[in-house]
Amino acid sequence: ITATAMKAAQIQPQAAVTLTTPTAVDFTSIPSWANRITALFSGVSTNGTSVPIVQLGDSGGFETSGYTGSVSIGSQTSAWTVVATPAAGFGITTTTAAGSAYTGKLILDRINGNEWIASGEWAQTTATITTNLLQGAKTLSATLTQVRLTTSGGSDQFDAGTFNVSYE
């Protein structure tokens, strides 16, 4: 077993980012050998109504289309609803309000070549308490090297919470 193989078998956490005013947070040094990426959210909220999304990128930049899948949302007071994830990224919810906070994780697994499968779960613990589930897929044009947290509109600012990425 080589040192590279041993390192690839270990979870490699990155430095967590405290969200105070950015419109996007980028993790840009994901190695080509990574087969699983976990994005962690703790109390993540924005100052607007654009849905937080995760975008994947390669050497050509972040890809802003071609994401497929669905988001399911349920609560104690309402039946489950299911909608398509935004085509611009993996959405963690369907609609949001300023200050709504989300805690959970998104797991990205390489299924083959540049094709990635996404599975996520979040709790929204402000306003109406909900559970949000995501299943999706994205095929990149080249090897994944970066992950971005932004919003579907791209202009709302994150105003609270912590975001981090690990890979293995």
In which residue ranges do the predicted regions lie?
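Surface-exposed molecular-recognition determinants
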Residues: 4-168
